[in-house]
UniProtKB/Swiss-Prot annotation:
Keyword DNA repair applies: no
Entry EC no(s): 2.4.2.-
UniProt signal peptide: 1-28
GO MF assignments: glycosyltransferase activity
Domain of life where this protein originates: Bacteria
UniProt family annotation: Belongs to the AftB family.
Protein name listed in UniProt: Terminal beta-(1->2)-arabinofuranosyltransferase
Pathway assigned to this chain's UniProt record: Cell wall biogenesis; cell wall polysaccharide biosynthesis
InterPro entries reported in the protein's UniProt record: AftB-like, AftB-like_mycobacteriaceae
Coarse class of the protein's main subcellular location: membrane
Organism whose genome encodes this protein: Mycobacterium tuberculosis (strain ATCC 25618 / H37Rv)
Transmembrane segments: 81-101, 115-135, 138-158, 183-203, 211-231, 263-283, 307-327, 338-358, 370-390
Gene name for this UniProt entry: aftB
Organism lineage string: Bacteria, Bacillati, Actinomycetota, Actinomycetes, Mycobacteriales
Length: 627
């Protein structure tokens, strides 16, 4: 009965989650950013966003390379569909593993007892609309669920060592490997994977096993970190640098929590889960076939760490730590997204719950009936809340408006802005303001140009490329090929709709190394905390830098000053670390200077940057005459 009811619950939740996620299928602009990198990988340009500039534009390393493999296997299939399929499958797999892990947690105490397994925490998670939104989206959210579900299931198995069978070194190595990969799934998951590895090291009974844990858990993340430092010249992805993950915005973080909680009253299931968990702990048995006796080199602390209660504390503590991390960061601009993983962790111990049928063995029948009644009542409360929350209007009228909080329902925002209920491909985003016009502008400038967004959604401001009048560059060299660059915030939809030879740059620093090294603005919209002036972009390229070649709202003096500021030796070193050809010498130099490059910041006002760097302020022409 227990096993049948567990699998029925798993199947029911997976079907509901899959159906609900498919009804809200989409690919986010940030998801398209990842696909631009995958396009470059498939084209042989390396893991970059723009050719000739080594920027790690994606937070999840594992998700990037998983999509790369999927795109390679998929061949002619559109990358958007590959991302959609992988995200959906991994989301469902994560939910299945969560429930199987929780079922395994309770299984030993249910041996020989009659019980029905019912979904509880799993229902809560899939009822929250953002959980179904980000089950697709093209972001790493599905991979996050699959990873957390797998780690939870494996940690539960590890916490239940059998007396009749010694621990398998293969399983131990696999668990250490999975825990070590946490930082490749998302950088902040190092808190989760690191804690799991520490628990394993404490419980390990021999030095040989400790060495195995360290090697299996540390080899891949350490190897990739060395690659990141040498190839990108940074300690962290460019996305972390752009959002200054070392900073804190506690007040904005609390606004984000409130924004996530208010539409769904999330406190209700969380409050109900506490007495539910306590009742389940009261009713559980201590089965004799688990290892309860002392063993050589296996002391009290090791036994306490390698136990189901410790693993429950681990997953709940991980959820709390992740939530605190994101609250400190200020949350995100996407409604609910970054709090889904903490919620998933907090609900894991009650993903499914056993309803014990009274048998008079451990409790009197009357006590057993009271216990069943209490558990059933709490479960009905959770199920009722789930039904209500699943049909919640969410953020309501504010879902598609960028209000003072800076938080929007990203799926609804892009559905409204593109006119597509399910924006799935880059072509769907051509109906987003300015997107169709950018293709026209690129086709109309065969000699090369920098495109700046204008106030008119149907046109772009153009800055021509400097071309030698004789057709040859100084010194008799052939003239440079026409180049195009586009300066825009939505670099995902833009990057996927233009060729890989078009440089796509942003002002917030996700794909622009110059913007990434500016200071974080204190009161800016969360996730968009940096804002590089377009004057820098004109100065940092082969573009005309004087009137009338530049738009009237650009200050030519600022362009001149920005061009001079780019000659700052430290700034040139940072830019050369990602733009100079990668050689062994460059790689080793980047490794040695990656800490310095990660900490380096410039002032976004060119004049102030010149003063900071100790350079002379050049004399330049004033603004253009006004008619």
């Amino acid at each position: 009965m227990v096993r049948v009811s567990l699998w029925l619950s798993v199947t029911a939740v997976a079907v509901l989650f899959g159906w609900g996620s498919w009804q809200r299928r989409w690919i986010a602009d940030d998801g398209l950013i990842v696909l631009r990198t995958v396009r470059n990988l498939l084209a042989g340009n390396g893991p970059v966003f723009n050719q000739g500039e080594r920027v790690e534009a994606n937070t999840s390393t594992a998700w990037t390379y998983l999509l790369y493999v999927g795109g390679w296997v998929g061949g002619p299939m559109r990358l958007e569909y590959v991302a959609l399929a992988l995200a959906m499958v991994l989301s469902l797999l994560g939910m299945v593993l969560l429930m199987l892990g929780t079922g395994r947690l309770y299984a030993p105490s249910l041996r020989g007892r009659r019980a029905i397994m019912l979904p509880a925490g799993a229902l809560v998670y899939i009822a929250v609309p953002p959980a179904r939104d980000f089950a697709t989206s093209g972001l790493e959210s599905g991979l996050v669920l699959a990873y957390l579900g797998l780690l939870w299931w494996m940690m539960v198995c590890w916490s239940q060592p059998l007396r009749a069978r010694p621990d398998s070194q293969m399983f131990l190595g696999a668990l250490a490997f999975v825990a070590g990969c946490s930082v490749l799934v998302r950088p902040e998951f190092a808190l989760i994977g690191g804690l799991a590895l520490i628990m394993m090291l404490i419980a390990a009974r021999t030095w040989r096993r400790r060495v195995l844990i360290v090697l299996a858990g540390g080899f891949l993340p350490v190897a990739y970190q060395i690659f990141r430092m040498g190839y990108y010249g940074l300690l962290v992805p460019s996305t972390a640098l752009a959002k200054d993950a070392a900073g804190d915005k506690w007040s904005q973080g609390m606004i984000y929590v409130s924004n996530f909680n208010r539409p769904y009253a999330l406190w209700v299931p969380l409050v109900l889960s506490v007495p539910l968990g306590l009742l389940l702990m009261t009713a559980r048995r201590r089965p004799s076939f688990l290892r309860p006796v002392l063993a050589p080199d296996y002391g009290r602390v090791a036994r306490a760490v390698q136990s189901p209660p410790a693993v429950v504390a681990f997953i709940v503590g991980s959820g709390v730590l992740q939530a605190l991390y994101w609250i400190r960061q200020g949350g995100d601009f996407m409604h609910g997204r970054v709090l889904l993983a903490p919620l998933f962790c907090l609900l894991a111990p009650v993903g499914v719950i056993p309803i014990l049928l009274p048998d008079g063995k451990d409790f009197s029948r009357e006590t057993g009936r009271w216990l069943v009644g209490a558990l059933s009542g709490l479960w009905l409360g959770i199920a009722g809340w789930s039904l209500w929350a699943a049909n919640s209007p969410g953020m309501g009228d504010d879902a598609t408006r960028v209000t003072y909080s800076g938080i929007v329902d990203e799926r609804r925002f892009y559905a409204q802005a593109t006119g597509h209920a399910h924006p799935l491909t880059a072509a769907d985003y051509l109906d987003y303001p300015r997107m169709a016009a950018v293709l026209t502008a690129l086709n109309n400038t065969p000699e090369g140009a920098l495109l700046l967004p204008s106030g008119n959604y149907n046109q772009w401001d153009l800055v021509p490329m400097i071309r030698p009048s004789s057709g040859t560059a100084p010194g008799g060299k052939p003239a440079p090929k026409p180049q195009h660059a586009v300066f825009f915030t939505n670099m995902g939809m833009l990057g996927m709709n233009v060729g890989l030879d078009v440089r796509v740059i942003d002002q917030i620093g996700l794909v622009n190394p110059l913007a990434a090294h500016t200071e974080r603005l204190k009161h800016a919209r969360i996730g968009h905390d940096k804002n590089l002036f377009p004057d820098w972009v004109i100065a940092d390229g082969p573009w005309v830098k004087w009137y009338p070649g530049i738009p009237g709202y650009i200050d030519q003096q600022w362009v001149t000053q920005a061009e001079a500021a780019l000659q700052c030796p430290a700034t040139r070193a940072v830019l050369n670390s990602v733009r100079a050809p990668i050689t062994l010498h460059r790689f080793l130099s980047n490794v040695l200077h990656s800490y310095e490059f990660t900490r380096y910041r410039i002032d976004r006002v060119p004049r102030y940057e010149l003063v900071r760097c100790g350079l002379d302020v050049p004399d330049g022409p004033g603004p253009p005459p006004r008619e």
